[in-house]
Amino acid sequence: MKLADLEIRDLHVSAEDKEILRGIDLDVERGKVHALMGPNGSGKSTLANAIMGHPAFEVTEGTITFKGEDLTEADPDVRSQAGLFMAFQYPVAIPGVSVSKYLRMVINAHREGRGEEAIKIKDFAKVAQEAMELANIPRDFSSRYLNDGFSGGEKKRMELLQLALLRPEIAVLDETDSGLDIDALRTVAEGVNRFAGPEMGVLIITHYQRILHLVKPDFVHVMFEGRIVKEGGPELVGVLEEKGYGWIREEVAASPTGGGV
């Protein structure tokens, strides 16, 4: 039996002394698209932040293992260098730092973690241009300040550019469809479909179904009150679209354990 690349076992996570995740089990492997759904406040973004090691979220029980290595206590940069990536719901703007400069800093941080020399400017220019073409982003994008004055769609394209440049093994997309019009949503979906493949697994976190009409998931996981309570294939998206989350609440309430798949 093939082991998953990212394995989460009995994960309990707290923030500000409040338990948010209450025993998460989840496997994500390269070559597959996973959708993590659930109503607002169910703990989806907390799970994403815990995967990446955000210091505001404390793992109190359980483990996060990536490619056989326990990363539960690892710093965020270690996780990133190992091949994990997260696209944030609300990317931060950094006035005064160009997209090009930021991307070169990110690449060099990864190279330093592998014990390699900093990338030469001409080599960076080549790989950056290739990534921009792959992500369908105009060349003048690189000279703009990072996310400064960017529209919602442009911020998401910036995340796609990082995907194209870094080629992570597992990409966590935290509500990357939030606030996008249909054209921007199509752009994001096209990028995800372009990059997802045998060498990259994707975990799409959303409480909407619309992006999942454009990016077909292999597996769907539904969260409620800090637990994954339902799992299935892409057909589960249609059920949630038709019925909403009310029936999930009813199933959880009727369960002797108050949860469970």
What is each stretch, according to the model?
Residues L163-A164:
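ABC ATPase C-loop
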Residues M37-P39:
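The feature captures the beta-strand-to-loop junction immediately N-terminal to the Walker
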Residues M86, Y90, G96-E112, F124-V127:
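Q-loop/switch helix immediately C-terminal to the Walker
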Residues E175-T176, D183:
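Walker B catalytic motif
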Residues L6-I8, L21-G23:
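Conserved structural motif at the start of ABC-family nucleotide-binding domains
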Residues T63-R79, N147:
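ABC ATPase NBD Q-loop/coupling interface
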Residues M223, R227-E250:
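Conserved beta-strand-loop-alpha-helix hinge in the C-terminal portion
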